[in-house]
Curated annotation (Swiss-Prot):
Site location (Transition state stabilizer): 180, 241
Molecular function terms, GO-annotated: acetate kinase activity; ATP binding; magnesium ion binding
Keywords per UniProt: ATP-binding, Cytoplasm, Kinase, Magnesium, Metal-binding, Nucleotide-binding, Transferase
Protein name: Acetate kinase
């Protein structure tokens, strides 16, 4: 059984075709600069060089159609025909309070996703365009929506509500939603598998650290708290996002600099975080600059690691203990520097890092010492596989 996973951004489309019997990737790639000049399609087939094709893609429908044409191209030998695709799984950023799990898409579901647009004005519209395009191009293939926010819908009210007038929540849905849910869920499940213990007996803190970063407290298989909030701007200092700041800074800086609300929003989302501190948004550059003696890069790295450690400490308290701490995503999987810096704050928990084991990159491993009371782990995330699994489960069991 083959599942096509799609992740539609405002001007991009990432795709992956998976063979679910072996859980292997048959093809993956992306279409970039949709609707802009210089758009191109990239096809990445196992064991072959990447194929790049520059051509105009005016919208998502044209882009998806081009991807489907490539998947059935005879010379690649991926699919004989499009009927071989059992189902399509769509990554949808925001499901609000409407969705606490993945769903088979129909008109009613699509309408509910459209109602969440005001919560994710940049992300949900292209997700919807991708679904509509697939309905047109593959009308008989079932489609499933997998929501970034769904995993965190198990948070209790004390964790998801803010200390603002209650009617803001009732009228506008202002609350903590959390993001990266598919990733947090995948690595929590994987951790229980590696540890050989049932998920419902574990307290796990998952650290999804990349250009966008979030930490989650997963108790007995359920998310009970997470660092991102109403939007993905809350929580940790990130590549270009500020993370937590005093809300009064917003009005203060608007007055001082004569900025509009939209301008401040743009600065906090795109010009802040480690970029604002150091001038670099890529953690690889920051590590390089820091080791070369760049003071601002060093500061940005210290701030980031300090904040990750603070969240881990807070979530250990929220769960009244922790069995495992998992590092995942681009920085979490590949930066031994970040992991070492974070873990030096965690000895009070009985979490001890094995510096030799910590040298690994992008591989599954337990990197704590044998006598560490808390297991420290690296688990590469695989959101596409998680989306494909949930898609297939729904389609097969419907």
């Amino acid at each position: 059984m083959k599942v096509l996973v799609l992740n539609c951004g405002s001007s991009s489309l990432k795709y992956q075709l998976l063979d679910m019997e072996k859980e292997t990737v048959l093809a993956k790639g992306l279409v970039e600069r949709i609707g802009l000049e210089g758009s191109r399609l990239i096809i990445d087939l196992p064991g072959r060089e990447k194929i790049k094709k520059e051509q105009p893609f005016v919208n998502h429908e044209v882009a998806i159609n081009a991807v489907l044409e490539e998947l059935v191209r005879e010379e690649y030998g991926i699919l004989r025909n499009l009927e071989e695709i059992t189902a399509i799984g769509h990554r949808i950023v925001h499901g609000g309070e409407k969705f606490s799990g993945s769903v088979i898409i129909n008109e009613e579901i699509l309408k509910a996703v459209e109602e969440c647009v005001n919560l994710a004005p940049l992300h949900n519209p292209p997700n919807i365009l991708g679904i509509r395009a697939c309905q047109k191009l593959l009308p008989n293939t079932p489609q499933v929506g997998v929501f970034d926010t769904a995993f965190h819908q198990t948070m209790p009210r004390k964790a998801y509500l803010y200390g603002v007038p209650y009617y803001w929540y009732e009228k506008y849905g202002i609350r903590r939603y959390g993001f990266h849910g598919t990733s947090h869920k995948y690595v929590a499940y994987k951790a229980s598998e590696i540890l050989g213990k049932p998920l419902n007996e574990l307290k796990i803190i998952t650290c999804h650290l990349g250009n966008g970063s979030s930490v989650a407290a997963v108790k007995e298989g359920k998310s009970i708290d997470t660092s991102m909030g109403f939007t993905p701007l809350e929580g940790l200092l990130m590549g270009t996002r500020s993370g937590n700041i005093d809300p009064a800074i917003v009005t203060f800086i608007q007055e001082k600099e004569g900025l509009s609300a939209a301008q401040v929003n743009d600065i906090l989302n795109k010009k802040s975080g480690v970029l604002g501190i150091s001038g670099y948004s890529d953690f690889r550059d920051i590590e390089e600059r820091a080791s070369a003696g760049d003071d601002k890069a060093k500061l940005a790295l210290e701030m980031f690691c300090y904040q990750v450690a603070k969240y881990i400490g807070a979530y250990a308290a929220a769960m009244n203990g922790v069995d495992a701490i998992v590092f995942t995503a681009g920085v979490g999987e590949n930066s031994d520097v970040v992991r070492k810096e974070v873990c030096k704050y965690l000895e009070f928990l009985g979490a001890t890092l094995d510096e030799e084991k910590n040298k690994i990159r992008g591989k599954e491993a337990i990197i704590s010492t044998p006598d560490s009371k808390v297991k420290i782990m690296v688990i590469p995330t695989n959101e596409e596989l998680m989306i494909a699994k949930e898609t297939l489960e729904l389609v097969v069991n419907k």
